[in-house]
Amino acid sequence: MRTTYMAKPNDVDRKWYIVDATDVSLGRLASVVASILRGKNKPTFTPNVDTGDNVIVINAEKVALTGRKASNKIYYHHTGFAGGLKSRTAGNFRDENPEKLIETSVQGMLPKNSLGHQMALKLHVYAGADHKHEAQKPEVLDITNLI
């Protein structure tokens, strides 16, 4: 009788991928990146083990917001003080902090537990085309074929 393969944390082979976010829809980009961070693109995927790869997202400032999301979609956060509800539109969010916009979108698609937090640490987002991970020799991932 065959048994289901369960990956061990020591057996995981991690790769580095680089994704260009230029003119790619935010949600579609986030779903593909979250899938790679979870390791769902590998045959050794195990839900309770972090089998995912590292992902570098460049040109975050050029990510596309379709429709009227740039002006109508609102992101809220609370400071913790009375009357401290803050809001900003997706367009302002992209202009002020494009890295945080993509990180927030991807984290929303990862598990809401300690394993999801561990997966989110493997995401590296940069507003421009420059990044500091050349030594890892990242593999270019054409995201338009995966959407």
From Swiss-Prot:
<dbReference type="GO" id="GO:0022625">
    <property type="term" value="C:cytosolic large ribosomal subunit"/>
</dbReference>
<dbReference type="GO" id="GO:0003735">
    <property type="term" value="F:structural constituent of ribosome"/>
</dbReference>
<dbReference type="InterPro" id="IPR005823">
    <property type="entry name" value="Ribosomal_uL13_bac-type"/>
</dbReference>
<dbReference type="GO" id="GO:0003729">
    <property type="term" value="F:mRNA binding"/>
</dbReference>
<dbReference type="GO" id="GO:0006412">
    <property type="term" value="P:translation"/>
</dbReference>
<comment type="similarity">
    <text>Belongs to the universal ribosomal protein uL13 family.</text>
</comment>
<keyword id="KW-0689">Ribosomal protein</keyword>
<dbReference type="InterPro" id="IPR036899">
    <property type="entry name" value="Ribosomal_uL13_sf"/>
</dbReference>
<dbReference type="GO" id="GO:0017148">
    <property type="term" value="P:negative regulation of translation"/>
</dbReference>
<comment type="function">
    <text>This protein is one of the early assembly proteins of the 50S ribosomal subunit, although it is not seen to bind rRNA by itself. It is important during the early stages of 50S assembly.</text>
</comment>
<protein>
    <recommendedName>
        <fullName>Large ribosomal subunit protein uL13</fullName>
    </recommendedName>
</protein>
<keyword id="KW-0687">Ribonucleoprotein</keyword>
<dbReference type="InterPro" id="IPR005822">
    <property type="entry name" value="Ribosomal_uL13"/>
</dbReference>
<comment type="subunit">
    <text>Part of the 50S ribosomal subunit.</text>
</comment>
<dbReference type="Pfam" id="PF00572">
    <property type="entry name" value="Ribosomal_L13"/>
</dbReference>
